[in-house]
């Protein structure tokens, strides 16, 4: 049929992960998807064997799914992810490309059948949806010869950075989420909306060539995401706190909604999580604000212990607090078998907050 589509016409509607509230339908144009495909030309998808293990409806998956379909790559699709199965498929099919979220990398490296030699075929590894820890990046670079790319951004577009891990490691920037993608711009805003300078933390806003058309039937939510510079150009608000260093590398601090206001002081939950995750008996953790009549909010940690650990909650809490300032001190710990996650692997902190009853 004779069908003509304009580049600015709607192409798809993807839903946000809903980690902080009700998922929102995000509208993307044909131009946005064309730019996604053209931006991966250097990754040789025409000869690729691509492992697909995340939900097909997510923007995370589309990053490798669409280029591989467009260029005729081989797809190795998992109906449901499990770490040992993914490791086995990489070895069996000689996987060359994979988009994995941080928790998948963690579980695959911890699995009993993880062997670095089985990853020799892998040329490109990608990560997004949540920050990939510096320690995990180091393990990937040590155990594979692959190019590791970490993407930070929004399904909505606007804010987008890329970390080329081997280059970042050489420059001592591995803890960052990279530099702004070609054609993009980033700004850091203070609490009053003022522009901040290098190494000053504030809300990250950005603009790119790939920007959604807003939220489906959510006009107010769309407007709330907008920020305009002095020239009237549209930027998107990320809802994340971070800073740009003097070389333009972006470092994340926390989600604005995840910051804890205790006794008038802002506490970054990620700082506390890093302290907990560095403990030998902790697999992973999530820290949220617990209501407190005395302080307003206090930090409370949900922790997954390593097998065989017999320490009680207070021992873990005190051990972590030894590395934190008194202002950051964790008030309590709850052990869990696993943390609640979305289908794409993001920790659902709103579910953790639902555990609380207001106490002094």
Q: Language model features by range: what are they?
A:
Residues 34-49, 57-97, 111:
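Conserved AMP-binding/adenylation subdomain of ANL enzymes
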Residues 70, 95-100, 109-172, 185, ...:
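Gly/Ser/Thr-rich phosphate-binding loop
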Residues 90, 98-101, 208, 213-214, ...:
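AMP-binding/adenylate-forming catalytic core of the ANL superfamily
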């Amino acid at each position: 049929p004779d069908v003509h589509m304009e580049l600015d016409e709607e192409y798809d509607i993807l839903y946000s992960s809903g980690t902080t509230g009700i998922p929102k339908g995000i509208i993307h144009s044909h131009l946005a998807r064309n730019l996604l495909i053209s931006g991966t030309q250097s990754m040789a998808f025409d000869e690729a064997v691509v492992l697909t293990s995340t939900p097909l409806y997510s923007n995370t998956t589309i990053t490798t799914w669409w280029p591989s379909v467009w260029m005729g790559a081989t797809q190795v699709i998992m109906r449901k992810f499990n770490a040992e199965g993914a490791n086995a498929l990489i070895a069996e099919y000689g996987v060359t490309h994979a988009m994995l979220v941080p928790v998948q990398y963690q579980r695959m490296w911890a699995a009993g059948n993880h062997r670095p030699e089985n990853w020799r075929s892998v040329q490109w590894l990608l990560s997004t949806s949540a920050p990939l820890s510096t320690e995990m990046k180091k393990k990937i670079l040590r155990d594979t010869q692959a190019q590791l790319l970490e993407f930070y951004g929004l399904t909505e577009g606007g804010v987008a950075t890329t970390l080329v891990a081997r280059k970042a490691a050489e420059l001592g920037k591995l803890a960052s989420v990279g530099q702004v993608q070609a054609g993009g711009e980033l700004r850091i805003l203070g609490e009053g909306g003022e522009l901040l300078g290098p190494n000053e933390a504030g809300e990250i806003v950005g603009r790119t060539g790939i920007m959604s058309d807003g939220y489906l039937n959510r006009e107010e939510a769309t407007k709330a995401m907008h920020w305009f510079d002095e020239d009237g150009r549209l930027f998107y608000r990320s809802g994340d706190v971070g800073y740009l260093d003097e070389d333009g590398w972006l470092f994340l601090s926390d989600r604005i909604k995840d910051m804890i206001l205790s006794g008038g002081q802002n506490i970054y939950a990620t700082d506390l999580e890093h302290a907990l995750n560095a403990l030998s008996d902790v697999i992973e953790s999530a820290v949220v604000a617990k209501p407190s009549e005395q302080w307003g909010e206090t930090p409370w940690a949900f922790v997954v212990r390593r097998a065989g650990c017999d320490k009680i909650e207070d021992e873990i809490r005190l051990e972590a607090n030894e590395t934190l300032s008194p202002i950051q001190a964790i008030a309590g710990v709850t052990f869990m078998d696993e943390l609640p996650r979305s289908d794409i692997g993001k920790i659902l902190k709103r579910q953790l907050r639902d555990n609380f009853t207001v106490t002094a």
